Amino acid sequence: MAISIKTPEDIEKMRVAGRLAAEVLEMIEPYVKPGVSTGELDRICNDYIVNEQHAVSACLGYHGYPKSVCISINEVVCHGIPDDAKLLKDGDIVNIDVTVIKDGFHGDTSKMFIVGKPTIMGERLCRITQESLYLALRMVKPGINLREIGAAIQKFVEAEGFSVVREYCGHGIGRGFHEEPQVLHYDSRETNVVLKPGMTFTIEPMVNAGKKEIRTMKDGWTVKTKDRSLSAQYEHTIVVTDNGCEILTLRKDDTIPAIISHDE
């Protein structure tokens, strides 16, 4: 399937969907504290998406996924299923991954929350993971190959003593939740996509404190690090512009501009 180039009208709708997804993460922040269940956080997010934003969660029912957001704690790499029995505790690192649909278009984003008092490793892993995403975002412009971006993420992460998960990647996005291209966060000879203005996709590195290997739990969704080391992830949805990119899911706590341009 070809990579779709979005029209200005499409991009405007994606700005709206992206802003809504970012707002869910901004809204949930004060609720992420020791003693709260991931099931409760999911309900708060779902109520906000449905009743305040008048939007739809793309995750709910996607391939049978039972909840509205993914909440992944500590050694859980991704796709953690919210559960009333799963309570957050001091020092946990928690990824909340939100995808909303508004007016037919998707906005997909995730960030790490540190519960209560951070551990040194947890804080460092989260910081390096976010820095790897920012490094990638600053590289995006027409004419660059996605392979260069994946290689740069891998080099940066491994220089810090961490590893990049291979099995999951960023993806094209728009009317579809997962479109072409695949956006790998490591160097691969199979990647050969030259960026053009109007392409929309996510960059979402998953970084493990230990080794890169993962395993999927019996529920068929929850993915953990094989060595039980901590794992972190940050994700933004972006559009390639004529001279860089625009981040469609920027939050108030982000420390990178929404529009990155490479004009001389």
UniProtKB/Swiss-Prot annotation:
Highest taxon listed in the record's lineage: Bacteria
Keywords assigned: Aminopeptidase, Hydrolase, Metal-binding, Protease
Q: Residues that bind a divalent metal cation 1, according to the entry?
A: 97, 108, 235
What cofactor is needed? Answer: Co(2+); Zn(2+); Mn(2+); Fe(2+)
Q: What is this protein called?
A: Methionine aminopeptidase
> What biological-process terms (Gene Ontology) are attached?
proteolysis
> Quick one: which residues bind substrate?
79, 99, 178
* EC number(s) reported in the record: 3.4.11.18
Q: Which residues are a divalent metal cation 2-binding?
A: 108, 171, 204, 235
| Stated family | Belongs to the peptidase M24A family. Methionine aminopeptidase type 1 subfamily.
Q: What detail does the entry give on cofactor binding?
A: Binds 2 divalent metal cations per subunit. Has a high-affinity and a low affinity metal-binding site. The true nature of the physiological cofactor is under debate. The enzyme is active with cobalt, zinc, manganese or divalent iron ions. Most likely, methionine aminopeptidases function as mononuclear Fe(2+)-metalloproteases under physiological conditions, and the catalytically relevant metal-binding site has been assigned to the histidine-containing high-affinity site.
Q: How does it assemble?
A: Monomer.
The UniProt-reported impact of residue 178 to A is:
Reduces activity 9000-fold for the Co(2+)-complexed enzyme. Binds only one equivalent of the divalent metal cation with affinities identical to the wild-type enzyme
Q: Name one GO cellular component term.
A: cytosol
Instruction: Tell me the InterPro entries matching this sequence.
Output: Creatinase/aminopeptidase-like, Pept_M24, Pept_M24_MAP, Pept_M24A_MAP1
Catalytic reactions on record: Release of N-terminal amino acids, preferentially methionine, from peptides and arylamides
According to its UniProt entry, the function of this protein is described as: Removes the N-terminal methionine from nascent proteins. The N-terminal methionine is often cleaved when the second residue in the primary sequence is small and uncharged (Met-Ala-, Cys, Gly, Pro, Ser, Thr, or Val). Requires deformylation of the N(alpha)-formylated initiator methionine before it can be hydrolyzed.
Recorded GO terms, molecular function? ferrous iron binding; initiator methionyl aminopeptidase activity; metalloaminopeptidase activity
